[in-house]
């Protein structure tokens, strides 16, 4: 992906983070007093182009400022020129996007979701109820009508459906950080170049103009050798 997805002209990019864990959840890790950086919560940052559905960049790390900057630097390498970018309300994006993409003249906004407090009757696995969203322009002149993270959030669901290790209640979670990273790399490459998107009826790579055919699994494996 790094060889083929770079300096692309894009129009609208959406970014989000997907939670997972390696070995054990962060709360369990804290209870055991472990300081092993290769276990615990693992966040996958994803940037998707709204129209081609191409995954432009991804990053596996913690939900920290350092990893957010590492992710936005990858997005900067994958793109060129001005475009609109929308993220969720994670505060680290405000500096990271401007630092990595400000020179390209991007129009940056955040979609901040507002949640209601969980009633006592709900279980520990029940998601908080979203009661609304707030569109917050951060940099440049983003079009309010285009401020959305719907497409990347739909893609997050596809990720969870495609990889059992990312489902919330599972015994198939990753046991090693390297294995999760390798699985994500394979998934994103397959998604971009091999998997026909149901809406587009071609692969995202074909729609984005970086491939002229649907890749077979064999071709994908040869390209990574």
Specify the residue positions occupied by each region the protein language model found:
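Residue-level recognition of single "structural anchor" positions
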Residues: 1-225
């Amino acid at each position: 992906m790094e060889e083929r997805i770079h300096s692309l002209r894009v129009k609208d990019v959406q970014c989000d983070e997907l939670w997972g864990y390696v070995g054990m959840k962060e709360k369990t890790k804290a209870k055991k007093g472990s300081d092993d950086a290769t276990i615990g919560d693992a966040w996958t940052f994803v940037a998707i182009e709204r129209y081609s559905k191409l995954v432009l960049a991804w990053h596996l790390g913690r939900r920290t400022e350092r990893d957010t900057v590492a992710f936005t630097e990858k997005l900067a390498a994958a793109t060129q020129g001005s475009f609109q970018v929308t993220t969720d309300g994670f505060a680290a994006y405000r500096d990271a996007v401007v630092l990595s993409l400000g020179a390209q003249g991007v129009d940056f906004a955040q979609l901040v979701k507002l949640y209601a407090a969980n009633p006592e009757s709900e279980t520990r696995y029940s998601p908080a109820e979203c009661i609304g969203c707030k569109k917050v322009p951060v940099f440049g002149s983003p079009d309010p009508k285009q401020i959305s993270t719907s497409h990347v959030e739909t893609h997050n669901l596809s990720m969870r459906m495609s990889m059992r290790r990312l489902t919330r209640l599972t015994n198939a979670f990753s046991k090693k950080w390297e294995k999760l990273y390798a699985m994500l790399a394979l998934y994103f490459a397959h998604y971009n170049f091999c998997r026909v998107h149901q809406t587009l009826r071609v692969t995202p790579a074909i729609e984005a103009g970086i491939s002229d055919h649907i890749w077979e699994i064999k071709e994908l494996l040869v390209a990574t050798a």
